[in-house]
From Swiss-Prot:
Belongs to the UPF0302 family. This is UPF0302 protein BPUM_1989. InterPro entries: IDEAL_dom, UPF0302, UPF0302_N, UPF0302_N_sf, Virus_scaffolding_prot_C. It comes from the Bacteria. It comes from Bacillus pumilus (strain SAFR-032). Pfam families: IDEAL, UPF0302.
Length: 179
């Protein structure tokens, strides 16, 4: 079972992503920045694999991978026009938006693993081997837990450096819940 990803976690990931990777289309940066500036939109954003199966999905790629630069899917229509997708996002703020990011080492990135959600729209028969799927989910859960623990440890160290007892206590409680 997957816990929901918070708006702040999604924003933090997008900031990290934009600082570490260059998207093939500049409009993609505009879209991600627009989404980050609206919490109500970020609540509807889901980072997934295979966004082409979603009712409303976007695929964005960085320069370091050999994938399509940009695609927007809505129902059974696909476009490479980023401006049309931007207008759709603006006009349909209440609809879920599924984003697939193609970048080098995506599956080894704990930052990405922390926000990656299961795509509920992938056809069931797409997975031929349930054992592989279960194993992948376990690896992903372990990776997320490790990332969260490391992040909390870093924040605890920073709180100690600042002599911030209140933040330290709060973070220590969070860490004990993860352990």
């Amino acid at each position: 079972m997957q816990t929901p990803v918070s708006v702040n976690e999604k924003k933090e990931f997008i900031r990290w992503f934009l600082n570490h990777y260059q998207l093939k289309r500049r409009e993609c940066v505009w879209i991600l920045n627009y989404l980050m500036s609206h919490d109500s939109l970020m609540e509807k954003v889901h980072f997934v694999e295979q966004a082409e199966f979603c009712p409303r999905g976007i695929i964005m790629s960085t320069h370091c991978v050999d994938e399509v630069p940009f695609r927007f899917y809505k129902e059974n229509i696909m476009t490479t026009d980023a401006e049309k997708s931007f207008h759709d996002i603006r006009l349909n703020k209440q609809q879920d938006l599924f984003i697939q990011l193609n970048f080098r080492s995506a599956y080894r990135s704990p930052e990405y693993a922390a926000v990656l959600e299961t795509n509920p729209h992938i056809p069931k028969d797409l997975y031929e081997n349930e054992k592989d799927k279960d194993l992948a989910e376990k690896v992903l859960e372990h990776s997320i837990a490790t990332f969260q623990k490391e992040r909390l440890m870093k924040e605890i160290d920073e709180a100690l450096d600042r002599h911030d007892q209140e933040t330290f206590n709060k973070l220590a409680r969070e860490l004990s819940l993860l352990s």
